[in-house]
């Protein structure tokens, strides 16, 4: 090989290496709620920040900074008894400035699973107006291909319906991509097929079939 040919080959290899390295600093995996002491209960804020990153409204490098700002606005009021978790109704209000349409959907009329029943109890507890919510029976079916949902789950294998306020809430971002439903968990920072998330966490989570639906 001529010297000029070797030089060109070296440039190509160097360029490919630089490109592969640059991918690790942008996009997924994102910062997670486990990265800082302040963010251990900030899954709602991180789910919102992930939505902003996925829809190119913020840089992936700004996820943690954005989540911290959002978290201060969406935490439950101390009197609510939910500690430092995120209030879904505050998430709805905060999301309005980032999405073209925002709606809360849940199995309101005929809750079947413990998670669905918990959401109905919390719904009744806060005196929410049912006319402002959409009744669904399956989250994946209700989610459009161009929508995202900040989904609510309970990070326990079981739900305590006798003491509904004792159930912590966890938020994940769920969406369709290339015909497959994906979930992006703030505890992990990287998307995985929805079915993998369910199969890998069935002893850890109780699914509530509810969440804040966002469309850019």
Give residue spans per PLM region.
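Active-site-adjacent structural segments surrounding the nucleophilic cysteine of cysteine proteases
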Residues: 20-98
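Active-site-adjacent substructure of cysteine-protease-like catalytic cores
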Residues: 121-181
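Noncatalytic regulatory segments and standalone regulatory/sensor domains
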Residues: 160-166, 173-216
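Bacterial N-terminal signal peptides
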Residues: 10-16
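Mature extracellular "passenger" or substrate-interacting domains of secreted, surface-exposed proteins
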Residues: 44, 109-115, 136, 142, ...
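Surface-exposed acidic loop/strand-edge motifs in secreted or periplasmic proteins
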Residues: 95-130
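Short amphipathic alpha-helical segments that mediate assembly, nucleic-acid/protein binding
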Residues: 9, 63-64, 114-115, 119
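Bacterial N-terminal signal peptides that target proteins for export
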Residues: 1-8
